Amino acid sequence: MKPFAMLFLAAVLYSGFVFPRPMQQTEADAERYIIECEGQWAASSASGDTTALQRFLADDFLGVDPDGSMYNKEGAISETKTGPKTFVSNHTNEVNVRFYGDTAVAQGSESWERRSGQPRYGRYVWTDTWVRRDGNWQIVAAEDVEVAEKAPTK
């Protein structure tokens, strides 16, 4: 009986190394990740880099632009990559994240400067809904509202 118990214990311990379980992410880690991703999304509208968007926008993502038009993941990536580069810069300001189990709601704002046109400076206030699927946080829904902002003082 003892050899069987030792063999069983060895098999259990070995399986933990061969088939590691996903690392449990703390809420603080998830919050940092979400805030970082929100910053990458804002920056991508000026840079055209869609690498981060491809990772954190869910395949079934659906967003609403300030003008009320709806867009999906494919549209967001296409517009960011090949659309006109409207913004010189775009960066997040504050981002607040609240968790509800495997769902998180991120609310924040970002400030931008256009290459041309009016208004030259502005701000988006937004709400993004994140869902944890298979251990990965992804945005499933987004809504943006455009608000006026004064030109920065230099």
Indicate residue ranges for each PLM-predicted region.
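Positively charged n-region of N-terminal signal peptides that target proteins for export
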Residues: 1-5
